[in-house]
Amino acid sequence: MVGLSAATLQGAPVVTQDIDLWFENLGDPKFRSALKEIGGFFVPPFGANPPQIGGEGLDLFDVVVHLHGLEPFRKEYCRSKKIRVGNVILHVLPLDRIVKSKRALGRKKDEAVLPVLLDACRAISGGKKRRRAKLLRELGR
């Protein structure tokens, strides 16, 4: 998962209308099988239209095949955060990588949300530093 939906799962106070899912290989039989299992289907790209997922209740999912400013899928996947949502573990693009991609893309709508994402990065980073310092104090270091 990438984009603002991924940022929200990491604590960023943002809203979005869709869930962006980044796929390495849309031709993978597992991708098609998973879609079929949930009653969905794949709509390949045509002209200026990007690839899409179709099916009842699936219109809020957007297919992403490339993220500007980032490493290839496999490298970014290795950096992903695992976040539990209900009974499912999701691989989520880390907040700092979302920021990097939005900066590289440079769309007005991305630039508008960057200050909020950067504040969230600082808050999350600061929280980790405080927890680490507290743990070190408790250990007497």
Model region roles, listed by residue range:
Residues 1-141:
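Compositionally biased terminal segments of proteins
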